[in-house]
Curated annotation (Swiss-Prot):
Protein name (database record): Protein TIFY 11f
Statement: the UniProt record of this protein carries the keyword Repeat: yes
Family: Belongs to the TIFY/JAZ family.
Main localization category: nucleus
Motif Nuclear localization signal location, chain numbering: 126-133
Annotated region described as Disordered, given as residue ranges: 267-330
Role of this protein: Repressor of jasmonate responses.
Domain of life, source organism: Eukaryota
Organism of derivation: Oryza sativa subsp. japonica (Rice)
Post-translational modification summary for this protein: Ubiquitinated. Targeted for degradation by the SCF(COI1) E3 ubiquitin ligase-proteasome pathway during jasmonate signaling.
Motif (Jas): 124-142
Keywords: Jasmonic acid signaling pathway, Nucleus, Repeat, Transcription, Transcription regulation, Ubl conjugation
Cellular localisation: Nucleus
Tify domain: residues covered: 61-97, 228-264
Amino acid sequence: MAVSDHHCGGGGRSWRFAVACGVLSRCVKAEAAAAANGRHRHHPTMLLMPGADVEPDVREEAAAAAQLKIMYGGRMLVFDDFFPAGGAVVELVRAAARAGQDVRRAGAARRRVGDSRGLDAGLPVVRKVSLQRFVEKRRRMRVYHILYTDKSSHHVPGPGRYRSWQCRIIIAAVAGAGGFVVACGVLSRCVKAEAAAAAANGRRHHHHHHTTMLLMPGADVEPDVREEAAAAAQLKIMYGGRMLVFDDFFPAGGAVVELVRAAARAGRDDDGARARRRPAGGEEGVAAAVRGEEKSQAARGDGAVHTRHSPPMLPARTPGSGRTDDAAFY
């Protein structure tokens, strides 16, 4: 019995050992297969700044108010407490660009008209010369007609007939070869007619009208030369430590005034938006705050403005003005 029990007990141990070896072999194979598949898995990297990619639940504070400066032609207009909410600065820059483009188109059109006139400048000269010849010939015929008519009549013409006798003398003198003799005859008859009229009216003293000599001859004559257009200057818009520069900005067409009005209008819109965003009591205040936040987010969706860093700020010439009338700028 003891031997049999010993053999039976030994057989049970050997069977258990074989089962344990089989289980161990399967576990080793499974771990090897898992290790081979694990090489192609993505291992997440540890963030150096945990929480950096998480959106904050706290609302960002509104941008602080800053000065808006518009400089053009050596003058500067300053708006204090100008808020950028609602895309006001973007709208201001767009107005400046639109005004500059309109003025450039008008200048190009004027230059094209001037070039077309310059091409035809030599054509009217021939017409002018022919017209002068025709008028001169007409004057000669008229002078001869008047002189011959007066000679045929045997009465002395009245003074009203020779009110422009100076012009007739000049025309007769230029009329031809015998113009000097004709001019002397016309002058003699004009003098006699004036003397007869003075004797008839009883005037002994002739009051002549003395013309005053101008101190600056030609000052009252309109110049024929066109005035040159206003020179182009730089338009600078500074806000929040940055500056936007428009080169070759012409002031024609009230572009600068329109720009200032746009800035003032944008400032008023921002003031109204801030007034609407003020906290109120009850459910109405919460609803108003929600509507104001939605409008501000929709306004921030406009395109960004390309700016460049500006040099140190210049001292404002008219601080705290904020006026929008034309006299404040000009």
